[in-house]
Amino acid sequence: MTAGGQAEAEGAGGEPGAARLPSRVARLLSALFYGTCSFLIVLVNKALLTTYGFPSPIFLGIGQMAATIMILYVSKLNKIIHFPDFDKKIPVKLFPLPLLYVGNHISGLSSTSKLSLPMFTVLRKFTIPLTLLLETIILGKQYSLNIILSVFAIILGAFIAAGSDLAFNLEGYIFVFLNDIFTAANGVYTKQKMDPKELGKYGVLFYNACFMIIPTLIISVSTGDLQQATEFNQWKNVVFILQFLLSCFLGFLLMYSTVLCSYYNSALTTAVVGAIKNVSVAYIGILIGGDYIFSLLNFVGLNICMAGGLRYSFLTLSSQLKPKPVGEENICLDLKS
């Protein structure tokens, strides 16, 4: 039983504080898990695509999908996890998630290879307002003025930083903005589709990867991406192979942690956790990335972004940790029953 499920079960006969605690812990831990996985995979992918010069981001994405399929399938066979067997209704239940999933995967890997780490992390923050907009339209959510102002601070900082980017790369900018759109849509639709009575967390992950690995392989072959991967001259380098396998495993962990964070939190909170993770990634990129060209305006914009993201996190966590009136909580539990 999940932490959220335990909370509901305890709420029927226990005290309100006890009912809230597991859900609160699950929210915080799932957000921390997602932030850690997101942080690690950006560093590993950056090393593969930039330091080693690996020319095939689509092939790397295929490796991450294959790792996801194998890990989940073996876990199901060993009865560690459960998700429904395939039937003809599953593609209809999932749509449009597989398309958003592969678009998010390919655009993310492509943009990582074409931009410096600090600029990549700044431009990825446009995922946040897009997620806010889509949650309002698709899920009918409403947010306070303080949260909206925090989001606008993130956007303002991103504009300032991007406007003074001394290593402007149009192709990289296009890929990262596509990645923002796909990430926002993927997060919102994942939240919508993740019904435990239907596919559940693991079913969404497994069937997404299954449906899109063959089309992605076809794209890789048709664009020459696969040929470049097979001709790459580092396949005898043990360190490179270990980093490639690590990236594949982290790709699975990132997908799982994203779904888990969206399950316990809102899609917007998941997007902002990714932005907070960028605090570490951006400053590490400035210090050791080797591809950041310093500009005062760029640096100021970067810090405005980070401040807005941290303020959003503070507001969101404060609202989650604030105890609800007992009467209101009982009403919520009655409705769930």
From Swiss-Prot:
GO CC, one annotated term: Golgi apparatus
Compartment(s) where it occurs, according to its Swiss-Prot or TrEMBL record: Golgi apparatus membrane
MF (Gene Ontology): antiporter activity; nucleotide-sugar transmembrane transporter activity; UDP-glucuronate transmembrane transporter activity; UDP-N-acetylgalactosamine transmembrane transporter activity; UDP-N-acetylglucosamine transmembrane transporter activity
UniProt-listed InterPro entries: Sugar_P_trans_dom (IPR004853), TPT_transporter (IPR050186)
Transmembrane stretches, start-end: 28-48, 54-74, 147-167, 168-188, 202-222, 238-258, 266-288, 293-315
Catalytic activity: UMP(out) + UDP-N-acetyl-alpha-D-glucosamine(in) = UMP(in) + UDP-N-acetyl-alpha-D-glucosamine(out); UMP(out) + UDP-alpha-D-glucose(in) = UMP(in) + UDP-alpha-D-glucose(out)
GO biological process: heparan sulfate proteoglycan biosynthetic process; keratan sulfate proteoglycan biosynthetic process; nucleotide-sugar transmembrane transport
A Pfam family matched in the record: TPT
Residue ranges that the UniProt entry lists as topological domain Extracellular: 49-53, 223-237, 289-292
Membrane disposition: Multi-pass membrane protein
Residue ranges annotated as Cytoplasmic topological domain: 1-27, 75-146, 189-201, 259-265, 316-337
Keywords: Antiport, Golgi apparatus, Membrane, Sugar transport, Transmembrane, Transmembrane helix, Transport
Tissue expression per record: Highly expressed in heart, kidney, small intestine, placenta, lung and peripheral blood leukocyte. Weakly expressed in skeletal muscle and spleen. Not expressed in brain, colon and thymus.
Family the UniProt entry places it in: Belongs to the TPT transporter family. SLC35D subfamily.
The protein's role, per its UniProt record: Nucleotide sugar antiporter transporting UDP-N-acetylglucosamine (UDP-GlcNAc) and UDP-glucose (UDP-Glc) from the cytosol into the lumen of the Golgi in exchange of UMP. By supplying UDP-N-acetylglucosamine, a donor substrate to heparan sulfate synthases, probably takes part in the synthesis of these glycoconjugates.
Protein name: Nucleotide sugar transporter SLC35D2
Organism: Homo sapiens
